[in-house]
Amino acid sequence: MARQFTLEKTRNIGIIAHIDAGKTTTTERILFHTGKIHKIGETHDGASQMDWMEQEQERGITITSAATTAFWKDHRVNIIDTPGHVDFTVEVSRSLRVLDGAVTVIDAQAGVEPQTETVWRQATEYKAPRIIFVNKMDKIGANFEYAVETLNQRLGVHANPIQWPIGAENDFTGIIDLVTLTAFEYDGSPEEKGKPIPIPSSLQDVAELKRNELIESLSNLDEELMLLYLEEKPISAEVLKKAIRKATLQASFFPVLCGSSFKNKGVVKMLDAIVDYLPAPCDVAPIVGIDEKNKEITRLNSDEEPFTALAFKVMTDPYVGKLTFFRIYAGKVNSGSYVFNTTKGTKERFGRLLQMHANSREEVKEAYAGDILAVVGLKGTTTGDTLAAEGQTIVLESMNFPEPVIEIAVEPKTKADQDKMGIALSKLAEEDPTFRVFSNHETGQTIIAGMGELHLDIIMERLKREFKIQANTTAPQVAYRETITQETETEGKFIRQSGGRGQYGHVWMRFEPNPGKGFEFVNKIVGGVVPREYVPAVQKGIQEALAGGILAGYPIVDIKATLFDGSYHDVDSSEMAFKIAASMSLKETKTKGNPVILEPIMNVEVVTPNDYVGNVIGDLTSRRGRLENQETRANAIAIKALVPLSEMFGYATVLRSNTQGRATFIMQFAKYEKTPKSITEEIIKQRS
């Protein structure tokens, strides 16, 4: 089957925003207007097409990124609708990794919110061009100019309206297109695409002023436009559109549109903007990877190049089994083809190729550069792996994911569910790189760890619904870590003689702090005092010992271990003896390395009416919070603070009580910090 849409006529975009800004409703309207669905489902009714998981429909939030494909004006638009809740930020990150551009949705009344800043930062990391849709213009308190101001102030970007609203709140009736200087009126019916009307006389001067501001702003980024502007020549819609596209693709300019997705106002114009201003795969830089010799390899966005793709998501489908979502950067692939997983060095066979629409699917036989699809049948491929044509060695840059910060113990209610639970949790961990499963060696309990209480709530619900496993959980625990703060040299010597062959392993290690770099092992042995074949055993012995901690049994992080001396016995030395000797040397750091316990510190932002600011600040301070910033937003005050996670359990209830239910808060991981001495002593006491 030949390619249906050229690369120039393809768009790969994400819908990103703070929770409740209207991302999923916006996506639903896009699907309706492009003919992908024929009945609009509402998020608040639990009938959204894109929020297909039961938990999403019940809670009215997006939990997992959902992919779909729509068609508009001879273009194929691949869309990924992403979550807005901070616990599911990883879904945004891995989606943006494979997308070429994004629509950022913001609330016209709230403007830029905390999670808007997070997803914007993620999109900036991936250099994704964006257009901005100021949604909910019909909402009480909607203020387009305020929303645009927050974009420039809080995000520090060059955002400029290319549309202007006609009215606001209940009086929001239409938009003015500043590029063409035409106006459109909406009656709110689902089929309404906007009726052309003359620009209202009360807004004629405003429209001309805002168009001039748009031209002036763009002229600093576009030479052709600058010459026309300086010579005071008329600037046509075509010239202006071309300048907007060019600056948007460079991510130096962000066009701002407006509307109300729920009331079907402005969505069609946003679809036009996606096609007009966001990049095609051939507009972005060729993908760069490395080969087995660490040399750079470039792949052009072309069907003629060798097949190169990135797996960005794994999920289990109840009907077809394990699905691997991937983006093709170069070349083409057929169902049934053999490909090479260059990250893991394994061969894989593509089963069925599927074009996804949320959780429904359409089978295709062939896929091309620029396509985003799912495939059935990959056995060992996980998120971040590179897939390439056989014989190719290119490895693309993978993805980095944050460490979990909260954990709970899980116990099945029946013995029969014990094995089933292990398999189910492994499947869920395969899907979600920020979810971890491990065993507590002291208690034998199964521990699950994630990004927040909601994250783990969803995992437990999925365990119950999808895998039919009933389980009990403990109260959430903080995922503490340990590290050393002082360089030290320690000896580990393991000798055992019990008739016949004995055991002998002996190492001298240098341990030093390695802030932010994780575990690093260096072999500095000279002269063979520790034979080469035992060095991997030394490294493994230390790595295994790191998991058990030295102060309170929490994993040790950010440590550099250098093997510099030791000895061996011709007969009695073994890998096991050197593993044990290495772990003994690590335990010595308890007295010599000045070890400390690290706790997760959270960025907390509380938005509260002015009347309750004192209550909120007092409470945050009592939780060992450090106030960072305070700013006025619309009719409220936003308070930013750094607070230890251990102090934040149950905060939602207390905040509700302190502010009569009128404040909201958002919390996300910031960093790990050393615990105060009194807290350290308390933690060690509890663990012992």
Swiss-Prot record:
InterPro entries linked: EF-G-like_DII (IPR053905), EFG_II (IPR041095), EFG_III (IPR009022), EFG_III/V (IPR035647), EFG_IV (IPR047872), EFG_V (IPR035649), EFG_V-like (IPR000640), G_TR_CS (IPR031157)
Domain of life: Bacteria
GO annotation, cellular component aspect: cytoplasm
PROSITE patterns for this protein: G_TR_1, G_TR_2
SUPFAM superfamilies the record matches: EF-G C-terminal domain-like, P-loop containing nucleoside triphosphate hydrolases, Ribosomal protein S5 domain 2-like, Translation proteins
Positions annotated to bind GTP: 17-24, 81-85, 135-138
Domain tr-type G: 8-282
Function: Catalyzes the GTP-dependent ribosomal translocation step during translation elongation. During this step, the ribosome changes from the pre-translocational (PRE) to the post-translocational (POST) state as the newly formed A-site-bound peptidyl-tRNA and P-site-bound deacylated tRNA move to the P and E sites, respectively. Catalyzes the coordinated movement of the two tRNA molecules, the mRNA and conformational changes in the ribosome.
Protein name (Swiss-Prot/TrEMBL): Elongation factor G
Organism of provenance: Phytoplasma australiense
Taxonomy of the source species: Bacteria, Bacillati, Mycoplasmatota, Mollicutes, Acholeplasmatales
Encoding gene per record: fusA
